[in-house]
């Protein structure tokens, strides 16, 4: 057997360099390749390390960094390999002279050189966050050394559980009528009471009006379930009074909706979470309010009022800019200092108040962050993001609690992640979309986020490029601290997208093992279905869950979710490690999460595929690989340093390498 095999015979190169992924030099932002003491601050030194497998005949490695707007270069020194390592380390030191320092590596080889598997080696190539490229490239995919204040350390280990409050759990505090529909003392005009087992509408006006009566005390009742999944952070969609059940059209930010139990219920929930060592992430719309919001009503009533400057009126009082021309969602004008004092800036703002007692939220998810502060020639998005980050920092100084700032973003967010504003995003573009494109039911007619087409079915080779390409444009901390979600309250359900239990298990394995914060939308763990974002907001069938009723609950998905998220908690590499791609085929993806304490290999298969033979040739002492988890129809066999990964159907295997 040769030293390195990379899949079935005749597999074409899967990288622009022409070098098989497993034989390529490697660097990433993880702790095995970037070393420094504590949080990196301006002026600190970082040790940068490049791993070159024994299969790759390198001649020299040099650093190219951009410091103070000018290029800095240095030759990397080879350091002795540790016993059992099958490759070479090259190292240098880089000073964080600027808040963000971009860098890459020039990798030279002798003309005509080949790898151990016989692949031609480029004599001249750049190693960037996008991989090995045998020509000159722009700086957009350079690695980045970031010296801004980091995200809270707890985010590295977090698993988020997303709850749409009205559909999660209804406590005994909510009165119901004889037909089981909620019957509060004061029912808003918009609300259409629904029995818990009635199916939500797929689309249409009714979607925002169906009121099931879930409340915050109901969430407290179900914390055991959330904790059993391995989740430690609860993300609530908006809790403020509004003109709809989704509450993204708030009528005030000063109190919690009485339909959910009011301020006292949110304080009770926060306290219950903190008693368990769990955390609370709240949801805020900074781009718009509802048309019934007290600020907007004051603005319409008096064009000379302070509140009139909070909005973008075109013809007062009824002509105004709104989110995507939805009249019920008037857009905020964040050029207004008075608005920012009330909404985003300082301890008295909406952002600041809910971080303090009695709520003590552990962070904010900002709705429509990509449009916040942007309209025509106005763009104050970065100012607002930095300002909110500053409000979180002030709260930390007051309370001692570190808080997380996450931005909703549906496409390429790299331009908004400089490192000093949002800690990360909801990673639809760099995680959800490519995973859907790979795992979607080939016959699916679903679309999402307004795309005027049905979902394509792409090969793993293309999907790996997408995952790597989007990731390459983000600073590593932003990538690690972004939310990875397979579905959310704004999309069809995972199960409806992929079509089968078997492919959903592969999706859960990807969620638990790729870099980023796993975020599970309540109901996905039981195989819930939904054809649109509105239809996906299905009430949780708690009686069926308790009875393990297989007609309503996919117990295999539930068990796999618990096992895989539990494994993530056990393996530090899956939480904090770097990412090294080893192989991509049409129906399989293979990568290693690298960490000084351990390396963990993950193989995902969407369908049956010929055996893939891999010698990872990773750094660290060679040890006997240990299979940590298997789901579906995947097998792994060990023959010395070579792994044989095969699949007769969809599945995944997780292997500890060292």
Residue ranges with predicted function:
Residues 63-67:
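Conserved aromatic beta-strand anchor motif in extracellular beta-sandwich/beta-rich domains
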Residues 2-30, 37, 46, 50, ...:
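Active-site and adjacent substrate-binding regions of carbohydrate-active enzymes
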Residues 99-103:
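Exposed beta-strand face motif in extracellular beta-rich ectodomains
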Residues 69-84, 92:
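Short, surface-exposed loop motifs enriched in S/T, G, D/E and P with embedded aromatic residues
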Residues 87-96, 642-646:
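Exposed aromatic-hydrophobic patches
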């Amino acid at each position: 057997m040769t030293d390195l095999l990379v899949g079935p015979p005749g597999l074409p190169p899967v990288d622009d360099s022409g070098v098989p992924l497993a034989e390529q030099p490697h660097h990433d932002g993880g702790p095995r390749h970037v070393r420094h003491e504590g949080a990196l601050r301006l002026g600190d030194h970082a040790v940068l390390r490049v791993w070159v497998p024994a299969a790759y005949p390198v001649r020299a490695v040099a650093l190219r960094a951009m410091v103070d707007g000018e290029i800095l270069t240095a030759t990397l020194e080879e350091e002795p390999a540790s016993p059992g390592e099958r490759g070479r380390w090259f190292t240098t030191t880089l000073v964080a002279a600027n808040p963000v320092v971009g860098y890459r590596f020039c990798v030279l080889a002798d003309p005509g050189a080949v790898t151990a598997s016989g692949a031609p080696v480029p004599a001249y190539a750049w190693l960037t966050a996008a991989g090995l490229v045998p020509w000159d490239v722009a700086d957009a995919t350079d690695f980045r050394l970031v010296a801004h204040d980091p995200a809270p350390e707890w985010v590295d280990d977090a698993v988020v559980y997303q709850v749409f409050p009205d559909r999660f759990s209804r406590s005994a505090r909510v009165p119901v009528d004889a037909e089981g529909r909620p019957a509060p003392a004061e029912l808003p005009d918009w609300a259409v009471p629904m029995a818990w087992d009635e199916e939500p509408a797929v689309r249409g006006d009714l979607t925002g009006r169906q009121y099931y009566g879930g409340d915050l005390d109901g969430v407290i009742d179900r914390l055991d379930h959330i904790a059993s999944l391995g989740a430690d952070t609860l993300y609530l969609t908006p809790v403020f009074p509004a003109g709809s059940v989704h509450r993204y059209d708030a009528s005030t930010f000063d109190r919690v909706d009485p339909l959910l139990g009011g301020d006292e219920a949110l304080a009770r929930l926060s306290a219950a979470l903190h008693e368990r060592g769990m955390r609370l992430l709240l949801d805020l719309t900074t781009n718009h309010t509802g048309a019934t919001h007290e600020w907007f009503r004051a603005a319409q009533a008096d064009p000379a009022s302070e509140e009139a400057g909070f909005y973008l009126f075109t013809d007062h009082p009824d002509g105004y800019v709104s989110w995507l021309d939805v009249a019920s969602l008037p857009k905020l004008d964040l050029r207004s200092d008075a608005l920012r004092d009330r909404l985003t800036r300082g301890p008295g703002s909406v952002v600041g108040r809910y971080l303090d007692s009695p709520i003590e939220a552990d962070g904010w998810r900002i709705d429509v962050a990509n449009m916040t502060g942007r309209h025509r020639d106005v763009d104050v998005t970065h100012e607002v993001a930095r300002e909110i980050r500053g409000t979180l920092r002030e709260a930390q100084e007051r309370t001692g609690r570190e808080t997380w700032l996450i931005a909703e973003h549906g496409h390429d967010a790299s331009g908004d992640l400089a490192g000093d504003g949002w800690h990360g995003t909801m990673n639809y573009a760099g995680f959800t979309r490519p995973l859907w494109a790979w795992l979607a039911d080939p016959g699916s007619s679903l679309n999402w986020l307004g795309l005027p087409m049905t979902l394509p079915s792409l090969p793993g080779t293309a999907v790996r490029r997408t995952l790597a390409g989007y990731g390459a444009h983000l600073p590593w901390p932003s990538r690690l601290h972004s939310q990875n979600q397979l579905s959310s309250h704004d999309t069809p359900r995972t199960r409806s997208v992929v079509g089968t239990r078997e492919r959903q298990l592969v999706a859960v394995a990807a969620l638990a093992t790729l870099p980023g914060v796993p975020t599970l939308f309540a109901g996905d763990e039981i195989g819930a279905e939904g054809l649109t974002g509105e239809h996906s907001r299905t009430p949780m069938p708690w009686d069926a869950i308790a009875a393990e009723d297989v007609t309503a609950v996919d117990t295999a998905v539930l068990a796999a979710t618990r096992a895989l998220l539990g494994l993530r908690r056990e393996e530090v590499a899956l939480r904090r490690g770097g990412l090294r791609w080893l192989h991509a085929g049409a129906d399989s993806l293979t990568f290693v999460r690298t960490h000084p304490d351990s390396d963990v290999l993950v193989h995902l298969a969407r369908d049956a595929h010929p055996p893939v033979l891999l010698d990872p040739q990773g750094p660290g002492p060679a040890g006997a690989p240990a299979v940590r988890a298997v789901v579906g129809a995947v097998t792994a066999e060990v023959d010395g340093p070579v792994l044989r990964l095969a699949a007769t159907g969809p599945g995944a295997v997780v292997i500890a390498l060292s």
